[in-house]
């Protein structure tokens, strides 16, 4: 009788230990798998094309811009489609220089230190660099939290620019479709976590 009881307790302990080890392994495996996927996603932003809708928020009004982005490693270019008054404006970042062109208004300028003129946070490769330099963490989407969605088709990659002197650009959150690994939107927040810029991505082509 004592032997049977001992064997039962021993078996119960073994099962409990197995369950704990399995849970830890499963959790670690999922986290490791997600981190690997995120690294692959961030590395894919070096070469891509996309149609983007940029919304800039301020205390007084909201401005929308529609543009096409072309990124090839260190060369980042966007062509403004709307609003109409700046249609055709071509902005290119190349080797630390900013090129601004608009044939309609016969404009062509080159700035040696573009960081003082234009922040290049609009581009996905800049987001990748920010994650490399500042680290990142994965957040749960509000939809998954509310609906307790176990599929989790969307992941949110957040990076915090602690040393950025521009108080309007402190937090960045990139929403990515986990199935096709295509970015959906980028939210940029100020130092008070108020949304400063929203960027919606359409027709994204990762090359």
Which sequence ranges carry the predicted segments?
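Beta-turn initiation residues at beta-strand->coil junctions
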Residues: 54-56, 80-83, 100-104, 161, ...
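C-terminal low-complexity, charged extensions that often adopt amphipathic alpha-helices
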Residues: 115-116, 120-129, 135-136, 140-141
């Amino acid at each position: 009788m004592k032997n049977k009881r001992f064997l039962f307790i021993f078996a119960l302990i073994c099962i409990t230990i197995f369950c704990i080890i399995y849970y830890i392994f499963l959790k670690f495996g999922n986290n490791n798998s997600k981190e690997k996927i995120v690294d692959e996603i961030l590395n894919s932003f070096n070469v891509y094309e996309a149609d983007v809708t940029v919304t800039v928020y301020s205390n007084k009004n909201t401005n929308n811009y529609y543009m096409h982005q072309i990124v090839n490693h260190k060369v980042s270019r966007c062509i403004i489609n709307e609003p109409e008054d700046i249609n055709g404006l071509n902005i290119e970042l190349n080797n630390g220089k900013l090129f601004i062109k608009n044939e309609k208004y016969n404009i062509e300028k080159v700035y040696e230190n573009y960081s003082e003129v234009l922040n290049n946070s609009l581009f996905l490769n800049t987001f990748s660099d920010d994650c490399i330099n500042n680290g990142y963490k994965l957040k749960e989407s509000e939809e998954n939290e509310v609906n307790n969605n176990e599929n989790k088709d969307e992941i949110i990659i957040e990076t915090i620019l602690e040393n950025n002197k521009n108080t309007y650009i402190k937090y960045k959150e990139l929403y990515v479709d986990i199935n096709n690994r295509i970015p959906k939107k980028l939210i940029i927040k100020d130092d008070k976590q108020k949304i400063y810029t929203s960027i919606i991505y359409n027709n994204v082509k990762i090359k």
